Each structure stands twice: as structure tokens, then as C-alpha cells.
Amino acid sequence: MLPCFQLLRIGGGRGVDLYTFHPPSGAGCTYRLGCRADLCDVALRPQQEPGFISEVHAELHAERRGDDWRVSLEDHSSQGTLVNNVRLPRGHRLELSDGDLLTFGPEGPPGTSPSEFYMFQQVRVKPQDFAAITIPRSRGEEGETRAGFRPMLPSQGAPQRPLSTLSPTPKATLILNSIGSLSKLHLQPLTFSRSGSGPQNPPVSTTPGEVRTTPSAPPPRNRRKSAHRVLAELDDEREAPESLPPVLIEPRKKLLRVEKTPPTPSGNRRGRPRKHPVSIPRAPPAAGGGEPCAAPCCCLPQEETVAWVQCDGCDTWFHVACVGCSIQAAKEADFRCPGCRVGIQS
């Protein structure tokens, strides 16, 4: 296996669907792409508006870098060359990466634009299996027609068998199928044979929708969604984002209320509901209406802001000043009223 790089045609066209390049040993070389077949190594012949392709539209510069090739694209056209839908300035070189989309001509989507679209890919293959381009035309004389496309053929005495007998799947098809993104482009790549019979069209492959005909297993139930259905009526579920699990929602630690106006009986308790509620939670009573709090000795705070705390045992509301605890302590720990503490001790 030798390092090579390929240009795979996307969409329709009258040229070859797959070009494989294996530069000769040395510092590097240059390959030309354009509409002049006698000057270029890759002939660009779009089905629509061939005038958008220049005689020498672009050049591929290959330089040796370790065991691989560093390939750059240079634009020489009048209509433009794009790499991944970004126009390349005329005369500017850009290093290509595996999987880049090359557009020769005006900008537009494949199938609707009179441009040539190719996928650039770096592979390791046997160059003779793909009739790789070795000697570029730019190194030969101007009128020499034999200096452009020189395929690497096997040596004398090597078996001349078609690729279909070497493996169940042709090697060209194996490389093309290794790019997952190409399956969405509905390509019809050509496989090459060394027996001299020319390119062969592979059998038409079915679309992804036709291949997956077996019924798939039903997706597992989302436990998070079922938990949200149970707690759908709580205020916490309307405030907390759906991406957070229910266990991360703050359970009960907003029972401490500091209000300028007396709290109203509206609103539900925060947190997960009890499985066996012992009593219905009671909201703090309104100012001036009955007993201010459930403390045996209510001191009736006269401040503008009154702090309330709810017992975690009996759900009864108390003034923070009446039960003798601090606001910070009520926020950080569970609060039990004197009656509940006596019940726990007994």
C-alpha cells in the first residue's frame, strides 16, 4: 500500500468519476485541472455551461511530507474555485484536508449549479489497482501527449485478474464506502478492472430507507419524562429546565419566607409531594386575621418585613422571631417546631 490522494466526482458529469494520484518519488509535482484535455491532467467537463470552466482552472501541488503527501490547491480561473463553499483568492494556495469539498466554477449546490464538485480524500492503496496518475503534464513538453496520464501497471508475469475476483467487494467500492458522508450524495462510483474491459458500473445500491426494512425494537421509555408527568402540577417543574433530572431540583428549602406584606394562602409547597400526606399544608395567615402564628407565645413582630418558617414535621407556619431561631439556621437545616420535637423524643 502506498500513500495516494483522490478526487471523487459528486453529481453528474461527462468525465471520470474517480481520479487517483500517486506522485513520483522526489520533492513534489503539480497537477492541472481544467477544460483543456491536452494541457490538464484532470479534464473538467460540466454538463451545463462549460464556459464557466477555464482552460487551466486550478492546480494541485503535491509535496512529500514524511510518509504522506501535503496537497495544496491554487486557483487560476475567472469564475472561481471554492473549498468547503469558501472562495479561494486567485493565485492563493490552500492546503487541503481529507474530506474537503472542491467546487470548480460559480458557487451553488450540486445538481443545480453549472460547476464541477469533487471530494478530496487521502488514502493508502495499490496505485495499479486504480490506474493512478503518476507523471503530471506540467513536467512534460507542451506538445507531448503521452506525458499526462501514465497508469502504474503490474510487472510482467503478474496475474491479470479483474478486481471482482480478488475480493467479494471491489477495492474501489471499499474506499468509497469508507466515507460516511458520501452515502447521502447518491453517488454511482465506477470500479476499475485490470483486465482491459474498462470501467464497470457496480449494481445499483438501495437507498438507506429501503435497506432498513426490519422493524426496530421500541425505544426505551424515558424515565425522566415519566417522572415529569408525575410532578407536572408542581411549581418546580414549571421553573426548572427539562434537561435537569427531578432529583436535582431543590426539594424543600424555600419554606423560609421574608415578606414585606403578609403571605397569602395561594401557592403549593415546593418539592416532591408526600406519598401519605398527614395534613394539608397551611399557608401563613394574613395580617390582622386571627392568630399571627402557631407559636404558644406569639410576640407579634412589628417590623416592616416579617420572616416566616414552616415546620418540616407538621407543616405549620411560625414567625422566625417567635420560635427563637435565625434565618440562616432555618435555611440550612430542617426546622421542627417544639411540638414535633417532643413527639420525636417520646
Curated annotation (Swiss-Prot):
Binding residues for Zn(2+) 1: 297, 299, 319, 322
Keyword Zinc: yes
Main location: nucleus
Stretches that traverse the bilayer: none
Subcellular location: Nucleus
Basic and acidic residues biased stretches: 138-147, 250-260
Zn-finger (PHD-type) residues: 294-343
GO molecular function: zinc ion binding
PROSITE patterns from the UniProt entry: FHA_DOMAIN, ZF_PHD_1
Ranges for region Disordered: 136-168, 190-289
Keywords: Metal-binding, Nucleus, Phosphoprotein, Transcription, Transcription regulation, Zinc, Zinc-finger
Pfam families according to UniProt: FHA, PHD
Domain FHA: start-end pairs: 31-88
Biased composition (Polar residues): 190-208
Stored CDD domains: FHA_TCF19, PHD_TCF19
Entry's Gene Ontology BP terms: regulation of gene expression
Binding residues annotated for Zn(2+) 2, in chain numbering: 311, 314, 337, 340
Modification type Phosphoserine: residues: 78
Gene3D superfamilies: 2.60.200.20, Zinc/RING finger domain, C3HC4 (zinc finger)
GO cellular component: nucleus
Protein's job: Potential transcription factor that may play a role in the regulation of genes involved in cell cycle G1/S transition. May bind to regulatory elements of genes, including the promoter of the transcription factor FOXO1.
Protein name: Transcription factor 19
